[in-house]
Amino acid sequence: MAHKKGVGSSRNGRDSRAQRLGVKRGDGQFVTAGSIIIRQRGTKVHPGRNVGIGGDDTLFAKTDGYVSFQRKGKDRKTVNVVPAATL
């Protein structure tokens, strides 16, 4: 007779890590060239002046400057980087 109960192993207990999407630099914050401003899926926010878009729709700064968010019309948001020299 067994003195211990046989214990089965569970097949649960795993989960994938979150994608860490969202705004990484806020309005008025200083960014350097190449800094990620927004990580997103699809173009929720569109690139404006001095902002590039990556293959996974990540928006990044092309020059050093300050982040500026704007609305274009009713349903389009853009993000710009205003160079520090122009301020």
UniProtKB/Swiss-Prot annotation:
One of its GO terms (molecular function) is structural constituent of ribosome. PROSITE patterns: RIBOSOMAL_L27. Belongs to the bacterial ribosomal protein bL27 family. The lineage of its organism: Bacteria, Bacillati, Bacillota, Clostridia, Thermoanaerobacterales. It comes from Desulforudis audaxviator (strain MP104C). This is Large ribosomal subunit protein bL27. Residues 1-21 are annotated as: Disordered. Pfam families: Ribosomal_L27 (PF01016). The keyword Cell inner membrane does not apply. It comes from the Bacteria. GO terms for cellular component: cytosolic large ribosomal subunit. InterPro entries: Ribosomal_bL27, Ribosomal_bL27_CS. GO terms for biological process: translation. NCBIfam families: L27 (TIGR00062). Keywords: Ribonucleoprotein, Ribosomal protein.
